Amino acid sequence: MDCVANFIEAKYHLAVAERMMKGYSKYPEKRFLIGVINELVRAISKLIRAFFIYENIKKGSLDKFLKKVAPKYLDDITIENLAKVIEIGQAQKVSPIEFAKGEKIILLIRGKYRFLTATRIDEFIKSFNTAISAFPKNFRQI
């Protein structure tokens, strides 16, 4: 796949995540927030692939992206939020306990309870929008 296709798929998954957040505001259920996290993880992985292709990096990893590629285009807060979303997405898949209380999701990750709020997930979406707009190609309007 080329750079443009990965970028378009990243924007698609972002749009799905944004629609799911709107759905959550109408029907506050845990599955919407979990869906938003999963869509953001997909979007971030597609955007990372697009950055690697743009930078002509053949074999990339998350660590390589965070240390070499991302600092060229993104601010520290955005980089931190993207890494946090991927970490949460991976942890959510293996978490033996996952439930919602109010607007919080509670996950058991490595023996510790972690709380994730809808507000924080919305911040992740905004950070990803920043990352999308920082992409160096001129096809952002797609």
Describe each PLM feature range:
Residues 1-32, 140-141:
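Charged alpha-helical initiation segments
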Residues 3-13, 36-40, 120, 124:
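Amphipathic alpha-helix face/heptad-repeat signature
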Residues 26-32, 52-64:
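Short acidic alpha-helical/loop segments enriched in Asp/Glu that coordinate divalent cations
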Residues 57-134:
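Long, charged low-complexity segments
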